[in-house]
Amino acid sequence: MDIKVYEEQVYRIKLGKNPLTESAFQKLIIKHLVNDDGYQCRKSSSYDPVYAMDVDLLFGFFERTQANQMEHLHALYNGGSRATILAKIRNAIAGRGLIDCIWHGVQFDAGIELSLVYPRPSADFDRKATALFDENVLSVMEEVYHKEGERIDLVIFLNGLAIFTIELKCESSGTGWDYRDAIRQYKFERDCKTPLLMSKVGALAHFAMDLHEVWACAALKGADSKFLPFNKGVREEGASHETRAGNPVVSDGIATSYMWEYVLTKDVVFSLIYDFVYYARDRKTNKKKDEKPIFPRFQQLRAVTRVAEDIMMAPGLTVRSRLSMTVRSP
């Protein structure tokens, strides 16, 4: 769809004159991520369903940030270095989980290690750490086939690693579908055993989103998939100030715009990965095989961020500590 066409649709829906199509909704999100959040927009043909990766983007990151290690690996594995590196990364993710590999990197032969991601530095005056952090690349793809005949609306990548999937619905369009239909698709029409959707191995969270609500799932299990609201909540007027489910009405925009204007920004994505996402073991068995991925609700993300902001403003806090707290609350 032409940019002018979908921008006109967005403008008109704000005026209540006509519905927003799902295609226009997708492109609105992509445009904001690219223009305002520094994302790269990648073609779906760049996606490798075997690895759930944008392989070229991942290897570009390696070559920019770890050229010496890559030179040694190329020499070590001869002509098959790319395939061998990918196989070892895939095996590491299958054994340890994606988030652990993001946190701790992947070991190769001869004691060589590759970092998949560089975390936010603890202080801005650490120039080397800041430069490496700046090399991290967030990207977005639309209409991604994770297997033949099954397509995901949007996939978010970090250095070529798929970290979030999003199914979009527009209840204002002719279908009348909303987030519940997106949840149904995830549960009954998506193969959760593919590398992209498999628990621990694939994306860290899966979002079902329409114009008014967002729901998230950390582990797809077919019909047993548990989606939880990822909404801001609506504070009621009056003395009680109670908060009810859903999102506040946005008179001049879309109620779920906080997803692309806040949640998917670089600072918040890194906060989610390093401060919130983890695997919880079953209290009874305490075994690794029984670990369950945990992803926060939006209120938890917002509450912790606001506490961090309050601490940051506390008298006596060192400059170093202030600089390490960069995520703003919505």
Place the predicted regions along the sequence by residue.
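ATP-dependent helicase/translocase motor core
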Residues: M1-P330
